[in-house]
Amino acid sequence: MSRYTGPSWKQSRRLGFSLTGTGKELARRNYVPGQHGPNNRSKLSEYGLQLAEKQKLRFSYGLSEKQFRNLFVQATKVKGGTLGFNFMILLERRLDNVVYRLGLATTRRQARQFVNHGHILVDGKRVDIPSYRVEVGQVISVREKSAKVPAILEAVEATIGRPAFVSFDAEKLEGSLTRLPERDEINPEINEALVVEFYNKML
């Protein structure tokens, strides 16, 4: 299954969950798209609930099903902690996500584009792989030639507050993951246990 590239508001309304984190797309129409949207939310089966929760998390990070499933498999090999939380941590450590958390992009999709286009450095070296796994303490910065890209500057200007697990210097356009996040600091609306149940049946 390929990565979804359509409007995020449609997916948000279909899932009843804000994929952008702002909630704006649900403010006026908190129902699925289509003519019968308001009356089209039926009660989900156990499998349906698990699938919906998996889709919420997958679309939030903008991954294809293959990427998402492969990362889950990697999480099963992490020692200590719960499988669901370990999976969430691996999602958070993706370079595109850290760029988004630092406020260098307004969305994860935009952050992925910045990484793909070579605008982002890790410890001074250009990394153009969105799935690159960031370590605590690594310095994420904007390449000198990209420091005046309007979209990056606008994102930094528009960012109000950043998670407690990152640090950021707006003048230098650089920051880092200072520690791994706690569970209540990332996607508290997601029930990752349902995602684990879904994949335990599939794998």
UniProtKB/Swiss-Prot annotation:
Domain S4 RNA-binding: from-to ranges: 93-156
InterPro entries for the chain: Ribosomal_uS4, Ribosomal_uS4_bac-type, Ribosomal_uS4_CS, Ribosomal_uS4_N, S4_RNA-bd, S4_RNA-bd_sf
GO MF term list: rRNA binding; structural constituent of ribosome
Keyword list, A-Z: Ribonucleoprotein, Ribosomal protein, RNA-binding, rRNA-binding
One GO CC term, this protein: small ribosomal subunit
Superkingdom field: Bacteria
Claim: Ribosomal protein is one of the keywords in the record: yes
GO BP terms: ribosomal small subunit biogenesis; translation
Pfam families: Ribosomal_S4 (PF00163), S4 (PF01479)
Subunit and interaction comment: Part of the 30S ribosomal subunit. Contacts protein S5. The interaction surface between S4 and S5 is involved in control of translational fidelity.
Function: One of the primary rRNA binding proteins, it binds directly to 16S rRNA where it nucleates assembly of the body of the 30S subunit.
Similarity remark: Belongs to the universal ribosomal protein uS4 family.
Protein name in UniProt: Small ribosomal subunit protein uS4
Organism: Streptococcus thermophilus (strain ATCC BAA-250 / LMG 18311)
